[in-house]
UniProtKB/Swiss-Prot annotation:
GO CC, any one term: nucleus
SUPFAM superfamilies per the UniProt record, alphabetical: Histone-fold
MF GO annotations: DNA binding; protein heterodimerization activity; structural constituent of chromatin
Keywords: Chromosome, DNA-binding, Nucleosome core, Nucleus
Organism: Volvox carteri
Keyword DNA-binding: yes
Family: Belongs to the histone H4 family.
Main location: nucleus
InterPro entries xrefs: CENP-T/H4_C, Histone-fold, Histone_H4, Histone_H4_CS
Listed name of the protein: Histone H4
Length: 103
């Protein structure tokens, strides 16, 4: 291993570069019925038509913030895999403590 730490990462033959599909407009995958079901769970009876796009925007911003913080924790620990604890710590940092996932 010659002093490279855990996992022996470092020099070596680089593997083939994989093509990754560019993700676009996936927020539309949060469908109108899915938003309606979430609202029903929250006790909402009637929903304005303008709510759906606004909900998608708010959800996207929330997830971007949580994922950014989670990845920061992962990079700081020099890992490549985001763990449940990274997400728990990211949520706690934003004042939304989540119980039931360790820690």
């Amino acid at each position: 291993m010659s002093g490279r730490g855990k996992g022996g990462k470092g020099l070596g033959k680089g593997g083939a570069k994989r093509h990754r599909k560019v993700l676009r407009d996936n927020i539309q995958g949060i469908t109108k019925p899915a938003i309606r079901r979430l609202a029903r769970r929250g006790g909402v009876k009637r929903i304005s038509g303008l709510i759906y796009e606004e909900t998608r925007t708010v959800l996207k911003n929330f997830l971007e913030n949580v994922i950014r913080d989670s990845v920061t924790y992962t990079e700081h620990a020099r890992r490549k895999t985001v763990t449940a604890m990274d997400v728990v710590y990211a949520l706690k940092r934003q004042g939304r403590t989540l119980y039931g996932f360790g820690g």
